[in-house]
Curated annotation (Swiss-Prot):
It comes from Atropa belladonna (Belladonna). Its main location: plastid. SUPFAM superfamilies: Ribosomal protein L16p/L10e. One of its GO terms (cellular component) is mitochondrial large ribosomal subunit. This is Large ribosomal subunit protein uL16c. Belongs to the universal ribosomal protein uL16 family. Keywords: Chloroplast, Plastid, Ribonucleoprotein, Ribosomal protein. GO terms for biological process: mitochondrial translation.
Amino acid sequence: MLSPKRTRFRKQHRGRMKGISYRGNHISFGKYALQALEPAWITSRQIEAGRRAMTRNARRGGKIWVRIFPDKPVTLRPAETRMGSGKGSPEYWVAVVKPGRILYEMGGVTENIARRAISLAASKMPIRTQFIIS
């Protein structure tokens, strides 16, 4: 699973996901890509599940680039804990994804293989996505 080696602060505010993605919304490495159409937090487990699905489907052919990184810690309180007494401890990491953001890129394979592999990765994502070709 992806996570930062070290961060400046252990805990973060939740923030808001307004507007569309102005960065990371163009294909820069491969020829085919998966693009987000909705805003969401995508966990490191979901990113890894999508990556595994793509590599398994493409087998030895092609190269895959993961264009998002989970750099936001999500904190959780233990179950059956009373209110108050501070913020919970960091449990997992998420990538903040806005509409238009490229999630995965793929190159070195034919279009039908890429389309099949990327559709498998899309089924692992908690949002609507689209397949795009550069």
